[in-house]
């Protein structure tokens, strides 16, 4: 038993000998040991081929990215070695296709091919990835940015969401978190075309409480009034268009109402619908100076009908008597 225990330890280092053998046999070019070393180098070269030299430095003479092949000039022997894109082991991660740049220094293994020497396991000096050809397409790492720019296109939605922010611009007691959320909306208002559309529409809805002199429905208190004079100055061009049309409609209506008052006794019912219409039309700011005139006329109109109404029953009583 003691003899068997002594014989077993020397048996362990025996398998280590073949592992060291390939390293020594590679430079000698042994056929049997070289095949085991080519196991890793053969697949990119496209088959089991003899290795002529390893870790050879050379400069790329030219490389066609479209066809996927080129030639490398060895620095030691000044020979041209054929290179295929499949032989490139470490490609530039930013490039789609495997390629080598013209005039680039490359480290590779020389292998025997069908028509001559070929390169295999092509990498940069020291095993670094290859730089690649400048004509090779880069990977589109910037695809995400145009997708981020997409949301600002919906300016109308942004303005609808930011209307509440404009109403409260004058409020001083605002937490910092809300103020930061409103800043991007302000930045998106810079394009002029998108500024004109919402502001041109807003005065129609925001003005009625001011011109109709109804303060109960006014939601915009301090901040809304501060923003209105600015909008008036910015959009003066829109006013004359609205001034021309509605005043022409007023005059015939007022004249017709005066004639009806003289000829008809029950005029109060007919005057109520036009008053509502006028109030709707007065929503525009342009008609502020014109508001007192129709109001005086309305007061005289409302004062006249009761006199006629009182005369009418007196006449009826006289006829009855």
UniProtKB/Swiss-Prot annotation:
The UniProt record lists the keyword Nucleus: yes
Principal location listed in the UniProt entry: cytoplasm
Site (Important for C5-methylcytosine-recognition): 62
InterPro entries in the record: Cold_shock_domain (IPR050181), CSD (IPR011129), CSD_CS (IPR019844), CSP_DNA-bd (IPR002059), NA-bd_OB-fold (IPR012340)
Sequence ranges of Basic and acidic residues compositional bias: 289-302
Compositionally biased region (Low complexity): 36-46, 191-203
Pfam families: CSD (PF00313)
Domain comment (free text): In the CSD domain, Trp-62 specifically recognizes C5-methylcytosine (m5C) modification through its indole ring.
Family affiliation: Belongs to the YBX1 family.
Protein name, UniProt field: Y-box-binding protein 1
